């Protein structure tokens, strides 16, 4: 879950140039090609085809890899500066909005100015018939005297029935968005994302378009028979993909925002998985569960560190499990990352050697086994992952009273918030020393 809103996102499928036409034909046939933006050529020579992210599923990606273009690279990325297509350049939504608002304002005897034009929104999020405007628009005092008719004009220009304007996330601990409803009688909206329905009130809850790559990845995991604990469930961003697509047997969903809990309960019902989920309302640090989880999701940024102790507590004592740890990592050249605090796409991986470290707290020896790391990863991501792994190993020993093995499986990029701030996810395998690694795992020795 996220602490801040973000601008509209253009998601693209990346592949090699020789497969571009096959990909385009398939995406057009499936009505997945984003016709408002141009196909982009990336710095490494790969080609990025803009897609309609809300309709794209992991099944589509698998079909591209296996049937449409066998042997092709098929990954998702976000285009930071997408170029409009020729069709879109006829007249953009922003241009239409500017023309309509200017005409309406001048009809009321108001002189149009460059300052007013600069105060119009340049980005927004569409939620069905509701448009959520960015916080940095309509700030001039003059607009106040033109309400509420102004909002009807704006809504008409954007082709919606309701309008809302966002502000910064409130520092209230529940990640409540500061959103004002400008036009309409309620803020409830619905999204269809990878075959999952999400309903929520935009004035009380948040929805992250930028997390689509991670939601698709979670949906593709094989969790059959597993019990999962989602420590920051929100409206079900990851809880629902784990249940609907990954096949988790049961999910314990923790959330302390009462408005998000209302939405989560509703979303579980409308997606037909309410019988496989228990909601734990309140502070997850006080969670009474223990020795139950095969997998724990810690989807909070900028850091989920406060949830690490309870994540260790809920892991099964006999065989352990996997932690999915979200984190914002600062990547400054020549500087060390600031742990509790890319647009690159994951490509090939290579194994890392086994490393044995001695616990400096006197808890004995902890075995850390290196898994795989993306060749696109920044070194700061890996250093943060190693630091997190060491801390988790120590926590596991403290919580369970015996040493555990920890192993970095992957470090996944989700998105970039700024040139030097990346949202990543660490997949960390945790096993008590008395249990064996899952069959097929090769523990490399130095």
Swiss-Prot record:
Record: residues binding S-adenosyl-L-methionine: 208, 215, 255, 283-284
Catalytic reactions of this protein: 4-demethylwyosine(37) in tRNA(Phe) + S-adenosyl-L-methionine = 4-demethyl-7-[(3S)-3-amino-3-carboxypropyl]wyosine(37) in tRNA(Phe) + S-methyl-5'-thioadenosine + H(+)
Its EC number(s): 2.5.1.114
Keyword terms, alphabetized: S-adenosyl-L-methionine, Transferase, tRNA processing
Record Pfam families: TRM5-TYW2_MTfase (PF02475), TYW2_N (PF25132), TYW2_N_2 (PF25133)
GO biological process: tRNA modification
Gene Ontology molecular function, alphabetical: tRNA 4-demethylwyosine alpha-amino-alpha-carboxypropyltransferase activity
Pathway the protein acts in: tRNA modification; wybutosine-tRNA(Phe) biosynthesis
Enzyme class (EC, first level): transferase
Record flagged with keyword NADP: no
Function per UniProt: S-adenosyl-L-methionine-dependent transferase that acts as a component of the wybutosine biosynthesis pathway. Wybutosine is a hyper modified guanosine with a tricyclic base found at the 3'-position adjacent to the anticodon of eukaryotic phenylalanine tRNA.
Stored PANTHER family: TRNA METHYLTRANSFERASE, TRNA WYBUTOSINE-SYNTHESIZING PROTEIN 2 HOMOLOG
Family indicated by similarity: Belongs to the class I-like SAM-binding methyltransferase superfamily. TRM5/TYW2 family.
Name of the featured protein: tRNA wybutosine-synthesizing protein 2 homolog
């Amino acid at each position: 879950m996220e602490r801040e809103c973000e601008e509209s996102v253009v998601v693209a499928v990346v592949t090699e140039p020789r497969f571009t036409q096959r990909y385009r034909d398939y995406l057009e046939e499936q009505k997945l090609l984003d016709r408002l933006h141009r196909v982009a050529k990336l710095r490494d020579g790969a080609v990025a085809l803009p897609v309609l992210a809300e309709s794209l599923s992991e099944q589509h990606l698998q079909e591209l890899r296996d049937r449409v273009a066998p042997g092709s690279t098929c990954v998702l990325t976000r285009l930071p500066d997408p170029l409009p297509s020729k069709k879109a350049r006829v007249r953009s939504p922003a241009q239409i909005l500017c023309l309509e608002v200017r005409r309406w304002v001048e009809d009321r005897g108001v002189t149009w100015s460059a300052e007013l034009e600069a105060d119009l929104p340049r980005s927004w999020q569409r939620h069905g018939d509701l448009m959520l405007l960015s916080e940095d628009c309509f700030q001039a005092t003059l607009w106040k005297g033109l309400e509420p008719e102004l909002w009807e004009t704006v809504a008409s220009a954007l082709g919606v029935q309701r309008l809302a304007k966002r502000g910064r996330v409130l520092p209230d601990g529940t990640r409540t968005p500061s959103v004002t409803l400008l036009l309409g009688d309620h803020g409830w909206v619905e999204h269809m994302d990878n075959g999952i329905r999400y309903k929520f009130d935009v004035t009380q809850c948040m929805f992250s378009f930028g997390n689509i790559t991670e939601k698709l990845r979670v949906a593709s995991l094989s969790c059959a028979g597993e019990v999962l604990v989602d420590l920051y469930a929100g409206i079900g961003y990851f809880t629902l993909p784990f249940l609907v697509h990954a096949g988790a047997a049961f999910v314990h969903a923790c959330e302390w925002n009462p408005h998000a809990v209302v939405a989560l309960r509703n979303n579980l019902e409308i997606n037909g998985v309410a019988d496989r989920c228990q909601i734990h309302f309140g502070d997850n640090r006080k969670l009474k569960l223990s020795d139950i989880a095969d997998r724990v999701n810690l989807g909070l940024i900028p850091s989920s560190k406060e949830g690490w102790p309870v994540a260790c507590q809920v892991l099964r004592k006999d065989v352990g499990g996997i932690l999915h740890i979200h984190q914002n990592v600062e990547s400054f050249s020549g500087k060390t990352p600031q742990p509790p605090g890319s647009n690159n796409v994951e490509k090939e991986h290579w194994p890392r050697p086994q490393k044995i470290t001695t616990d400096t707290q006197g808890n004995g020896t902890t075995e850390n086994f290196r898994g795989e790391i993306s060749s696109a990863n920044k070194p700061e991501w890996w250093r943060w992952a190693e630091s997190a792994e060491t801390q988790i190993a120590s926590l596991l020993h403290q919580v369970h009273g015996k040493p555990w093995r920890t192993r970095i499986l992957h470090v996944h990029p989700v998105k970039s918030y700024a040139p030097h701030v990346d949202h990543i996810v660490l997949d960390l395998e945790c096993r008590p020393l008395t249990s064996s690694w899952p069959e097929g795992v090769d523990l490399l020795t130095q």
